[in-house]
Amino acid sequence: MDRKTRRANFKNLQPRLTRSTKAAADTLSLSNFFATPENAEEVPSCLADIPVQPDPPAPKIKPIRTSNVFEKPGPKPKKAPKLKASTVSTSSGARRGRGKSKQQPSISNFLRNEQIFAEVTAQHCMADNFSADDIEMALALSKSESEKHGRLRLHDDDDAVVDLLDDEEKSTERIRHKLQKYGFRTAAKEDYKSLAVLPVVASKGGRRGKWANRFTSLTLRNPDVQQKKLEEKVSALLGQEMRGKEPNGEDCCLTPYTVITAALKELRAEGESRILREPSEGPIDDLESYYVTDLFEVSRTPAHHLLKNWAAIQGRDFSPERETQKCRQLRQQHELVYAELERYYGDPQKLEEEVMQELDELEKLVADNMIEDDSVVINIVEAESSSTGSSPSKEPPDKRPKMTMEDKENLQPTTSKASLTVPAQSTRCTSPDLFADSEDEPDIVTTAISNEPEDVRNLSMKVYKNVSISERSSSVAEIEIVSSNDEPSQITTYEVFSSDEVKTVSNATQEKISFDDDFIDLTQEFDMVEFNESKPRTPNLIASSETDSNVDNLNGDTILDFSSQEVSCPISKELYAKYAKVETFPVWNAAAEEEDKIEFSLSMERDLKSSEQSSHQLGILTTPNDTEHSSSFSELNFSRNSLRRSVSLSTDLSFKSPLNWKMNSSAEKRVSPAASPYKQSDASVDLTQNSDDENDAILLSDEEINYSIWKGNKTVKDLDIGDDSSDSCFASPVTKKRAIPQFQTEEDLDAFLMDFSTDGNGSQGSHSPNKSALSKERAEFGILDAAPSQPFSLSELQSHADKEKSSDNEINWAEASFLDAPAKPLSRRSSHKFNELLAKISKPAHNSGDDFDEFDQMVFQSTKEAASSAGETSDMPQGLDLLLKGEIKTTAIPETRAPGNQTPIEPQQVDVDGNVYSVRVCHTPKPDFATLPESEILQQLYKYGIKPLKRKQAVKMLEFIYNQTHPIMKTAAVQDLPARSEPIVRSKSTPVIMERPHSQVAKSTSKTLKAIGTKKDLTFNDATGEELLRFSQSLAPSLCDDFETFVMQTNVTKKTPQPLVPLHIAWHNLICANPQLHESVLTYEPIDLQAVYLHLKHMGHRYDPKDLKTFFDRRCIIFRYELGAPGKQAERHVRRHTKKPSKRK
C-alpha cells in the first residue's frame, strides 16, 4: 500500500467534523503565493483552507475576512464563530459540500493573514526607513474611511480596501500595486523569498503555545532603533540651555502681609525687626531667629523624662513641664544647703573642739552605762549599706541574699589589705570615714602615710582585721585601732565586701604574736578549746553566732583597744580602774591566770519578739603577757551622732524593712546635754517602722540613709582622708550602736523626750547656721525632723502661740516625702506609719475639743472656717481639690499672723493601745446596705459606675467602697470621749500635720465637689493653667507600673505632625491638669470614657477605645460610656423581623 492510499484510508476513518481539510504545504510560503499566475482558476488560500465548492458563499465569508484583516488579535475564543449553513439542494455533492461548509475557517488562518501582512509591512518599513507608527496610523485611517463610506467602495477600484487574498483575480502584480498605493516601494519577486521562512505556528495541542508569539505591527519594532531614538531625544533635551531670568531686587523682597484686624496689629513686625534674606547668602546660621520664642517658654526637658523604657518608643516625645517658681526656689535652697554643709564640715578646728566636748560626755556615759557584771562584750556593727563597688546606691536591701549558717561558721582567717602606719598618740576620738570605697583604699592609705611625720612612719600597725565575709550584701566592717601620739590625727581603714567576692591579701607579720610594738593581734581565730588549752595568753577575735541561718539583727557597740601604759590616755585612770581592776600586770600568777578570761560586755538590745536573730560578738579576752601593759580604752570609737543613735536591723525574715536608727541616749545619764552640737536634728520621725515592733524607739527612715549615701559620694571625691574621717552629722549606716536598758519602756522614752525638749533650747547656738535650710535638705530625702532646733516633744503639740512667734523653728511640711514624689533612687516606698511618733506622746485632755483632725488643718486656712464648712458634703473631705492643686507653701519663711486673730481649735486625741489618734465624725451615718431597697442599691451602683449586680454581691461591693473611703477604728477602751457610735480615724496614709501658718492653703472653697460623670462638669480645657497640678521633676512611682504595656496611638501615619505619646503618659498629664478628674478617680466615681476619648482625640492623640477600656480596667478606674441609640437598635430589629417572613414565603 503506497502512501497516497494509506492517507486516503486514514482520512476516511476520521469523523466528518474533525477531519482535517486539505492544506497544501507549498501555499504557506509567500514566494509561492506571489508566484501564482493571475488567471489561475483555483488559488490556494492562506486565510481559510476551505475545500473547493461549486458556489462558495463568498458574501458571507467576506465580512469575517474584512473585519479581521487589520485587527489585533483579541483574547482567545473558546470556540470558533459558527457560519450559517448554506441552503443548497440535498444531492450527494451538495450534502458533501454542506458537510464541508460546516467546518468554519480556522482562526489561525486569519492570524496568519495578519502575520504575513505585518511581516511584509515591517520589511518595507525597514527598507524605506518608514516609521512603524505612521504605517499603523495609515492602516487605521484606511479602515475608518472604509467604514465611513460603506463596507467597500467597489465603484472605485483605486480606493478599494486592500484584501490580499480575496479571489482568483488577485495576482502578484495586484498585490504589488496595492502595496505601492500605500506608499511601499515594491521590489522584484525574488526579494520576497526571504519571507518563505516565516515562523509557522506549530500547534502542539497546548493552549499557551497556540497563542504565543502573535506579532503585530507594533510589537515587531527593533529595540535597538527605539533605544537609539530615546537616547537622541534625551541628549537633545540635555543639550538645551535653559537659563532662567535673574530675579530683581523687588522680587526678592517680598512685602509683608498687611494686617487688617485690630487684634493682630499689636503683633505686626516693625521694619527694623524684619528678616530680609537673599537666597544667595548661603545656609542659614541661626535658625532660631526665624521662630517665635516670646509667646511661650521653650522647654529643654529631655524627651525620655517620663518614659520607663526609652527604647520601647523610638522618636517620641512627651509633654514637658516648665520649671515652676517653686521648683526653682527649691533648687536654689538645695544649693545653699550643700554649700553651707561643705563650709561647715570643712573646718577641722571647729570639729576638733566639738569632738573634745563629746569625749568628756563620752567618759561619763561609759562610766554609767557600759559597766555591767564586770564584763564587756565587744561587738562590731556590720551595718548593711547599699554600697556595691564605688557607688553606694545601687542595690536595695531587699535584694540581698541571706547569710546562712555555713557562711557564719566558715569565716576563714585572711589577712588585711595593707599594713598602715599610725600615729603613736591620739588625744581625741574623731569620727571615722563612713564612706570609704574599697577601690579608693590604696590611694587613701598612701596619702595618709605620706602626710605623717617621720617619727610616726616608723610605727607599723599590725593587721587588725582578718575576716572573710560573704554576707547577703556589701558589708562595711569597721574597726579602729589607734595608738597614742602627740598629734591629733587618726587613720581609719575599711574593707568593703560584696556578696560575690572575698578579699584575701597577704601579710608578712601574721605569725608574729607578741606585744612588743604596742599592738593587739586580732587576726588570729581559734576554737574555744584550742584557745583555752594551747594559747592562753593571746587576745583573740572570737566570732560567736546563734543557731539561726538568717542574720537579720547585727548589733554592735564599740571597739575596745589595748595600747601602751606609758602613753597618755584620754580616759582617766579612775575610769580605767573600774574596767580593768588593776592598773598594771607586772607578774601573772595562778590567780591571774584564772582571771585572765575577763569578758568586757555591753548590754545590747534584743528583739525579744523574734527568735530568729543572731549577732556576731567579737570578745577580747585579756591574757597575760611578759611585758608590762595597761589595757586602756584609748578609742571607744563613737561617731558624733552615735551618742544618740544606734543601728538595728529588723528581724523580718524577708528583710523588707529598711535600716533604722534608734534614739538611745538616756536623759538621766547625760551630764552635759549641750556638749554635742547635733542633738537638735537627731530626733527623726520614722516613716517606715511597723506598728507591731516592740523596740519602742524612734527609728530613722531609709531616706536618711540615702542622704548619708549621697553625702558620702560627695565628700569622698572632694576631701582628703583627714576631712573624710569626720563627716556629716547624718552619719552613715556604719554607725556604732549603744544600747541603753532604760529605753525598754514607754515611760523612759517619754521622760527622755521631756528632758530632751528642756535641754534643746540651750544648745541652739552650736547647730549649723542655716537650720531651716538643713531641715529642708533632709526633707528632700524624706527625713522629717521633729523640729530643726529641738526634738519632737509634748511642748510642740501644746504651745502653738510660741511656735507662731518664731518662724525659724517652723518645719516646711510641704516638702515632705509623702506630699511630693520621692526624689532619690533608693526611696523605695513611703510608709504610712507616721503615727509611730504619736505613740510615744500622750496629749492633754484640753486638746480634745473638736472634730477636726490634722489632715484638715493642713488643708484649710482657718480651722473655724473648716469646722463650719465640714458638714457641707459627706462624700469626701472638704478642700481636697485645693490640696491636689499643690498650693501648699514651700517658702522657708512663712507668713506670720497675730496669734489673737484666731483661736486654734485642737482636734480630739484618743489614746488607744498606746497609739494616739485624732477623731472626727462623719455627719452622714453609714447606710445599711443590707436593708436598702433595690432601687437605692441600683442607684448607688450606678453612682460608682458598676453594672447591676445581685443583691448579695452589690451589698459586698458597696460595703467595700464605703470602708475604703470612710476608715473606721473600733476602740476597745476610749478615755475622755463623748457619747459617739464609733470614732473615725484617719487613714494610715494620711499625714499628721500640726497647726502651722505656712502649712495652710491661702484660700478655701465652699463649693461642693460633684461627680464628673456629666460633660458639663468635666472641663478638660484649661487655657490659663490654673488647675494644673505642680509636681516635682522626679518620676512619679505609679506612672508606669511593672506590668505596663505601652498603648500607642492608632493614627500613626507618615503625615502625623505631632509626636506620638503613649496612653499612660497622656493619662498622667490629663490627671495632672484636671484635679476634679483626679478626685473622681480617687473616690471611685465613674469617669466619662467618651469625654476622655474625645478630648484626647481633639489634642491629636487617638487611641483605640478597647485599649482605653483595658487601660482603665487594669487600674481599677471606673468609667461610663453611652451605648448606641436604642431607636436604631429597635429599627434594625424590626427590619430583620420583616425580612424573615418574606424569605419563608
From Swiss-Prot:
Residues 411-430, 613-633, 678-689 have a biased composition (Polar residues). It comes from the Eukaryota. InterPro entries: Structure-sp_endonuc_su_Slx4. It holds the Pfam family Slx4. Signal peptide: none annotated. GO terms for cellular component: protein-containing complex; Slx1-Slx4 complex. Residues 382-393 have a biased composition (Low complexity). Residues 48-108, 382-442, 613-634, 666-689 are annotated as: Disordered. Residues 321-372 form a coiled coil. Its main location: nucleus. GO terms for biological process: DNA repair; DNA replication; homologous recombination; meiotic chromosome segregation; oocyte fate determination; reciprocal meiotic recombination; resolution of meiotic recombination intermediates. It is found in: Nucleus. The keyword 4Fe-4S does not apply. Residues 395-410 have a biased composition (Basic and acidic residues). Regulatory subunit that interacts with and increases the activity of different structure-specific endonucleases. Has several distinct roles in protecting genome stability by resolving diverse forms of deleterious DNA structures originating from replication and recombination intermediates and from DNA damage. Component of the SLX1-SLX4 structure-specific endonuclease that resolves DNA secondary structures generated during DNA repair and recombination. Has endonuclease activity towards branched DNA substrates, introducing single-strand cuts in duplex DNA close to junctions with ss-DNA. Forms a heterodimer with SLX1. Interacts with mei-9; catalytic subunit of the MEI-9-ERCC1 endonuclease. Belongs to the SLX4 family. This is Structure-specific endonuclease subunit SLX4.
